[in-house]
Amino acid sequence: ALILPHGARYNAFMIDKTPPALADIEAAARVLAPYAVRTPLISCPALDERVGARVFVKPEILQRTGSFKFRGAFNKLSSIPQAARAGGVVAFSSGNHAQGVAAAAQILGMQAAIVMPADAPVSKRERTKGYGAEVVLYDRAREDREAIARDIAGKRGATLVPPYDD
């Protein structure tokens, strides 16, 4: 993995892959419908003029947890087989994915452990805990968040939910 600023890592799993099929998108929409906020599409005439096309903005700040990450997290957790849900989930994130996974796990009645950097904003750590997740702090200068998450998942029989590749 390539080390990026702030200890983030670029890894091969982050490379764009084949886009999801329309049927997969429609299935995800059905799964999310009862739980996700239906955020509006807002037109932006000034932006339309600037780029020479109609542009719509989707304010996902209005979504549960304040981010689009809830959608992906909920869809992923919903796909975990019932028998595997007892082990809970483990994720690693500085904030938005952490909160998305924590909120989705709470709704689905699953345990969640979230590996977060010790220097993540206190507000993000507290919101993640507020959704019922266990927050496991690490030192991003000295520790590998993915290794920590894999270790926790292995010990608990939990499903690892990375913030990418799904």
Locations of regions flagged by a protein language model:
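N-terminal amphipathic/basic-hydrophobic helices that include classical n-h-c signal peptides
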Residues: A1-F13
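PLP-dependent amino-acid enzyme catalytic core
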Residues: Y10-D166
